[in-house]
Amino acid sequence: MNNSNVMIDIETTGTQHHSAIVSVAVAIFDLLTGKIFAEEYIRIRWKEDCKICGGKIDADTFEWWVKQSPEARAELITSDDQLPPDDALMRLFEFIRKHCDGGPVYVWAKSP
């Protein structure tokens, strides 16, 4: 069993490197079969990312968010299950460490 492939999907407030992070979805999977071994969804206090970490909001991306479903737009609403940015990144790191084999980890994602 090869648990070293990690798929990450990040929702942000823009497409640039300085955009605030809204949420992170991560899955550990087998590259050959596509079987998912573990998955996690982490909501982030994106406004805190803006205030403390310098995250930016892109006008075009904001317009995109406004045009999404009510469920998608709800991701932007502050709630108790959102984590501070540093805690969210630590949770992501711990999830990957817990579920991946001891060897190299291969991270997969689609760029904007």
Show which residues each predicted segment covers.
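Catalytic and binding regions of secreted/periplasmic enzymes and modules that target cell-wall glycans
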Residues: P112
